[in-house]
Amino acid sequence: MTGIQLAGIRVGPIIGVAADPNYVAAGAPLGMIATDPDDPTDPWSAAAPPGGVIVQTPGPTAGPSATGTLRIPVPKNVPAGPRRVAIQAGHWKSDEVPDELRRLIPQTGAEWEGVTEVEINLDIAQRVGVILNSKGIAVDILPTTIPVGYVADAFVALHADSDGVGVNSGFKMAHGARRGPYEDALLNDIKDSFGGATGLNYDPTHISRNMTGYFSFNWSRFQHAVAAHTPAVILEMGYVSNDDDRALMLDHADLLANSIASGITKFLDETPRSKIFGQDLVVPAFPSRPSPRP
């Protein structure tokens, strides 16, 4: 059996990974990707995630631009019992990050007219947690620092943006690349629920590399990241710099929290754990550089 194709990610059967001659142990280098344009002295080098990977090089008939693939084993610590979800409150405890995330320390989030992004993020994250708990779902409210190789049935990072002038309005979402095949479903379920409940317009124009390359998604750059199998998305709930968006996030936090929880539960109902963690992932090698923002 050579695997199947799901949403652009090839999925294959579990094998004895440690015995494979191309196995790279957790934390071992996978080679340099590029240099950071903001700091050329700090090369962006990929490292194998917890559980390691198998490096599959291009075959003899591959074209000159082929880069091979990385085979990521199913995590050994897949949750048992109730479904488990992580809600990350963006920028919360950013001053407590480990050394590999040291560049995130000064990034404390947006602020406008005395209202901070982190207080909005944490408040709504906690409300989402209470709602999910009431449905029998186990919830981890996470700060900036993600547990090493974090594994759950879903991960949602909550943020609020600012344009610095108070013009932009709306919400936006993204997920990373070189991850599992179920992130589009998680994103769309939350997007539909959140947009329908809040009336906010979706703002795809301002989805940035900081979102698609969000550090928590980037298992090849950071050990403190979400495991590749775990469906993970980032939600920018609105613009703290916009009077209407800010009022919505402050005065109608329960509305936002319920809509986020509704999207998550829809995803969980339609995506059993056995599908998420049923097989190894095979993803393209050499991930893109991650974002430096929390």
Annotate the PLM regions:
Residues 161-167, 174-175, 208-294:
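Active-site-adjacent mobile loop/cap segments within catalytic or ligand-binding domains
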Residues 135-147, 198-209, 271-280:
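Surface-exposed patches in mature extracellular/periplasmic domains of secreted proteins
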Residues 1-77, 278-294:
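N-terminal secretory targeting signals
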Residues 126-137, 160, 191-199, 254, ...:
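Sec-exported extracytoplasmic/periplasmic mature domains
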Residues 91-94, 117, 145-149, 160-165, ...:
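Solvent-exposed loop/turn segments at secondary-structure junctions
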Residues 46-155, 160-162, 169-171:
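Active-site histidine-acidic residue metal-binding/catalytic motifs
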Residues 154, 181, 185-234:
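Catalytic cores of processing enzymes, dominated by hydrolases/peptidases
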Residues 111, 115-123, 180-185, 247-258:
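Soluble non-cytosolic domains of exported or imported proteins
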